């Protein structure tokens, strides 16, 4: 049976990437514990507007754990302490206790500048994809499903890699602000398939170069990214990216 909880929420306020930020505090009362976290933020904004205050800005879209837009640092954890394989939108207030203090912050990364409050600019991920996360080969009309024989294990693993939604939790969790889990997942989803092998060397080099130029840090294998990934991507992808990159450089 659902119960109501009351708590204090501290949420980050910042007008832009070059402005100083601060925390605002608001008391929330009688919130049903079957309310989602984003629904709770909607209630917060209704209360702020009724008080004549500016609403709190945060990113969201599908609210179905698909799009990766809901990027919030909740009580020191990207997406909060959700079930394994879930984003902020799948976090429910039953995860919190009556009287808690809940702290909400944006992704903290030089490569993700703050647009306003907890909404950040993640165009850097798009630029990494533009650097090589695709195939340029003209394939014509759709082939028969069995025209190119691919082992089921490879197809399954490529699908797992492709499930990365680009939310940026890996970057937010990493002490170095590294995007290696994201980049390696996007490289792996193509490297595992014959259609992606033709441009594999160029793809690995260009995407790693773009990642470095955009201000992301280097990977030091702390595995924090793997622990918070809502789609359960693993550092096996990072190992594969390293192999692809080394092979590409040796072939130069």
Regions found by a protein language model. Give the residues of each.
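Short, structured protein-protein interaction patches enriched in aromatics and acidic/basic residues
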Residues: 57-69
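Glycine-rich phosphate/adenylate-binding loop and adjacent beta-alpha elements
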Residues: 74-97, 101-104
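Long, hydrophobic/aromatic-enriched structural stretches that serve as scaffold segments
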Residues: 53-54, 69, 73
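Short strand-turn-strand beta-turns centered on an Asx-Gly dipeptide
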Residues: 12, 29, 74-76
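Short, contiguous acidic and Ser/Thr-rich linear segments
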Residues: 24-36
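Eukaryote-biased recognition of intrinsically disordered, low-complexity regulatory segments
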Residues: 4-27
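Ferredoxin-type iron-sulfur electron-transfer modules in oxidoreductases and energy-metabolism complexes
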Residues: 35-54, 102-252
């Amino acid at each position: 049976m659902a119960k109501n909880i009351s708590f204090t929420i501290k949420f980050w306020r910042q007008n832009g990437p070059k402005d100083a930020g601060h925390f605002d505090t608001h008391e929330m009362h009688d919130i049903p514990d079957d309310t989602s976290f984003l629904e709770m933020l909607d209630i917060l904004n209704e209360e702020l507007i009724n008080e004549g205050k500016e609403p709190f800005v945060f990113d969201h879209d599908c609210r179905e754990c698909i799009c990766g837009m809901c990027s919030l640092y909740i009580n020191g954890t990207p997406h909060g302490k959700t079930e394994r394989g879930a984003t902020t939108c799948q976090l429910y207030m039953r995860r919190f206790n009556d009287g808690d203090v809940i702290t909400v912050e944006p992704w903290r990364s030089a490569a993700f500048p703050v647009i306003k409050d907890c909404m950040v600019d993640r165009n850097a991920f798009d630029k990494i994809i533009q650097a090589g996360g695709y195939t340029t080969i003209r394939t014509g009309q759709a082939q028969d499903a069995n025209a190119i024989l691919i082992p089921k294990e490879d197809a399954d693993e490529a699908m797992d890699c492709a499930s990365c939604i680009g939310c940026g939790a890996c970057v937010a969790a990493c002490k170095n602000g590294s995007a290696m889990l994201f980049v390696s997942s996007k490289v792996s989803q193509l490297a595992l398939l014959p259609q992606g092998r033709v441009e594999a060397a160029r793809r690995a080099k260009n995407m790693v170069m773009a990642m470095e130029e955009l201000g992301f840090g280097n990977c030091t294998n702390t595995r924090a990214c793997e622990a918070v990934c809502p789609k359960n991507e693993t550092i096996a992808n990072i190992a594969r990216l390293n192999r692809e990159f080394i092979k590409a450089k040796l072939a130069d």
